[in-house]
């Protein structure tokens, strides 16, 4: 799983940062999921190594413009490219009306199916490999955070051990690789889990923006390998954060700490902390790391690989 940050500024773009969008690349299935779609997102995708043709799902947190103004342009481009089979879009009530109205008034007709899902807290998508859920955040308008949880899978199959037990290859190997119990022709009962390595723990990613510190974000980020959390303001500007219902760096760090997350990546920074100002982004990073040391600061086109965890590794660190 690979995370690419396409936009890391809050409210408005700057020369070095576009507005909100994060891409999740799933190489094992040549699929791309997008979280928020601020103005200019399609340009950011084109400047990256991502492929628009692989886009299959878009998750919108809320209906503020810096999170949705790039959506119609991206969808129109997907149609003109002609190589997108279908896109499912998930978001708050009103998202479908927005897309339909923009399409009608701009005379935009899509050459591929688009399905808009009005979400409510809970599981919103599930397949054999992933579960995606959402939860309420605390912002000025209805806002949702997302959690992508990869399902655990059986560890690596020990072919040599299977051969040593004179287990015939073929269909039976497939069953054993899945951890199933198989009865051989000679009557032996083989437990597939005994021929597989440690269970590969599914990776978990949480995406929480826009919000002030809230229990909903903590729940979504529980045991997350990566928590992507907004950090619009520095701690000294907490009054503005409470007024506008955005997070400070310390709120983001406290969320990661309370959730037991393994890594925090902050994003959605106010342009007021540009280089040369009294407070700069490097100062915001220090604030967060004082509370949660495993904190990084996102920048446009930053790529973060999410490694797998194994039960043995978790036992060693006492998780």
Curated annotation (Swiss-Prot):
An example Gene Ontology molecular-function term: zinc ion binding
The cofactor named in the record is:
Zn(2+)
Which keywords does this Swiss-Prot/TrEMBL entry list?
Endonuclease, Hydrolase, Metal-binding, Nuclease, tRNA processing, Zinc
Gene3D superfamilies, per database record: Ribonuclease Z/Hydroxyacylglutathione hydrolase-like
So which residues are the signal peptide here?
none
Q: Does the keyword tRNA processing apply?
A: yes
Record flagged with keyword Acyltransferase? no
Entry EC no(s): 3.1.26.11
- So where does Zn(2+) 2 get bound? 66-67, 210, 268
Give the residues annotated as active site: 66 (proton acceptor)
Q: One matching Pfam family, short form?
A: Lactamase_B
- Check the record and name the HAMAP family matching this protein: RNase_Z_BN
Biological function:
Zinc phosphodiesterase, which displays some tRNA 3'-processing endonuclease activity. Probably involved in tRNA maturation, by removing a 3'-trailer from precursor tRNA.
UniProt similarity note: Belongs to the RNase Z family.
**Which PANTHER family does UniProt cross-reference here?**
ZINC PHOSPHODIESTERASE ELAC PROTEIN 1 (PTHR46018:SF2)
Q: What is this protein called?
A: Ribonuclease Z
Q: Which organism is it from?
A: Nostoc punctiforme (strain ATCC 29133 / PCC 73102)
What is the taxonomic lineage of the source species? Bacteria, Bacillati, Cyanobacteriota, Cyanophyceae, Nostocales
**Chain's gene name:** rnz
């Amino acid at each position: 799983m690979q995370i690419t940050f396409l936009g890391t500024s809050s409210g408005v773009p700057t020369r070095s940062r576009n507005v909100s969008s994060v891409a999740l690349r799933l190489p094992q299935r040549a699929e791309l999921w997008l979280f928020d779609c601020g103005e200019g997102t399609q340009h950011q995708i084109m400047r990256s190594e991502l492929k628009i043709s692989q886009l299959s799902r878009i998750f919108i947190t809320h209906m503020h413009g810096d999170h949705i103004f790039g959506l119609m342009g991206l969808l129109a481009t997907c149609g003109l490219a002609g190589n997108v089979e279908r896109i499912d879009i998930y978001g708050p009530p009103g998202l479908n009306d927005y897309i339909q109205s923009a399409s009608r008034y701009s005379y935009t007709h899509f050459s591929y199916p688009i399905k808009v899902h009005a979400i409510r807290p809970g599981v919103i998508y599930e397949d054999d490999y992933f579960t995606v859920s959402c939860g309420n955040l605390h912002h000025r308008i209805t806002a949702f955070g997302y959690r992508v949880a990869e399902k655990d899978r059986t560890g690596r199959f020990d072919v040599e051990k299977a051969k040593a037990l004179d287990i015939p290859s073929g269909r039976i190997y497939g069953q054993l690789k899945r951890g199933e119990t198989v009865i051989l022709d000679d009557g032996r009962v083989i437990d597939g889990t005994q021929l597989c390595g440690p269970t590969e723990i599914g990776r978990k990613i949480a995406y929480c923006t826009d919000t002030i510190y809230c229990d909903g974000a903590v729940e979504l980020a529980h045991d997350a390998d990566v928590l992507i959390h907004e950090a619009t303001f520095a701690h000294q500007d907490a009054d503005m954060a409470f007024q506008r219902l955005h997070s400070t760096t310390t709120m983001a760090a406290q969320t990661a700490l309370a959730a037991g997350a393994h890594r925090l990546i902050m994003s959605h920074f106010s342009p007021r902390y540009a280089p040369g100002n009294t407070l700069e982004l490097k100062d915001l990073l220090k604030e967060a790391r004082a509370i949660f040391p495993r904190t990084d600061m996102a920048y446009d086109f930053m790529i973060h690989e999410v490694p797998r965890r194994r039960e043995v590794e978790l036992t060693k660190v006492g998780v």
